[in-house]
Amino acid sequence: AQCLVGSEMCIRDRSERMLIVTIMVIVGFMSGVLSNTGTAAVLIPVVIGIAAKSGYKRSRLLMPLVFAAAMGGNLSLIGAPGNLIAQSALKNINLSFGFFEYAIVGLPILIVGIIFYATIGFKILPNKEAPADDDSVFDQQQDFSNVPKWKQILSLVILVLTLLGMIFEEQTGIKLCIAGCLGALALIVTGVISEKEALKAIDLKTIFLFGGTLSLAAALEKTGAGELIADKVIGALGSYPSPYILTFVVFILCCVMTNFMSNTATTALMVPICLSIAQGMGADPRAVLMACVIGGSCAYATPIGMPANTMVVGAGGYTFMDYAKSGFPMIIIATVISMIILPIAFPFYP
């Protein structure tokens, strides 16, 4: 992937702004069909290499990269862990989101975000020299010249087939998790990667975080704590809260939480609460959960909101305030876009 995508990002006398557009487009759409964290991890060393060759400062290129990864995660069901958490909760009540349904809100946010950072937002991006003592693993360029062409082609074929299996889950009867496992197994069986390499690629931190927060979410639901919080939220808004105001409150609450917790943990924690709110009002749970997931993805203002943000702190020489300064305007933009689209595409009372 680094070899193929890197060739598309090559300099070709592009201006710095156009390079940011190219990076964000590629990262955004790759994050929609792969994991947003995985996409960022693959392309960070590519962008660092481009910065070195072009003479542009990496701090100006890496932050748009991780922001685009977060935005792109909202293009499909598999773009971010939070998307699947909401989907699992909906399936328990015989509802679901379509594979690309998140893109109804996510795609406009990505498009406007790209335009913003290529124009007005360009001026607020960090403009720092690379740290002199940076020894990040992402700074180490990997040589893919010895990788056989058949492995590159076969890996792409398996990726496409795996994605098709995920997209047509209902038609094939094969669950998302099974399709993903079959794709990974195919890579090992065909010799594209070894079993050791496959195991090394598994992020145990993410798995334990996912499992732990889902357990916490289940506890909130079974003990009635989720319902209690839901009642407090509804009570604070009055006997008959406006669906629009409630959508805004859920969205902002998830925005704030995701920047100080992980976005996955925020979604896992808020999903049962949002379900309780929807059921208490007799509203469509899909409307509340969409606001929860999109709000939970707005982890732009801190380096701890999502793993990709943390990955580039050292390489970009960023401070906490760099994220706040560059990311807060994007949160405002995402909020405005969401508050326009959500009530239309996902009404509380369809």
Identify what each model region corresponds to:
Residues E101-D231, T247, M330-T335, M339-P350:
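Hydrophobic transmembrane alpha-helices of multi-pass small-molecule transporters
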Residues N36-A40, I109-I111, I174-A184, G235-L246, ...:
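Structural signature of hydrophobic alpha-helical transmembrane segments
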Residues R17-V25, T39, L62-M63, A103-L107, ...:
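Hydrophobic alpha-helical transmembrane segments
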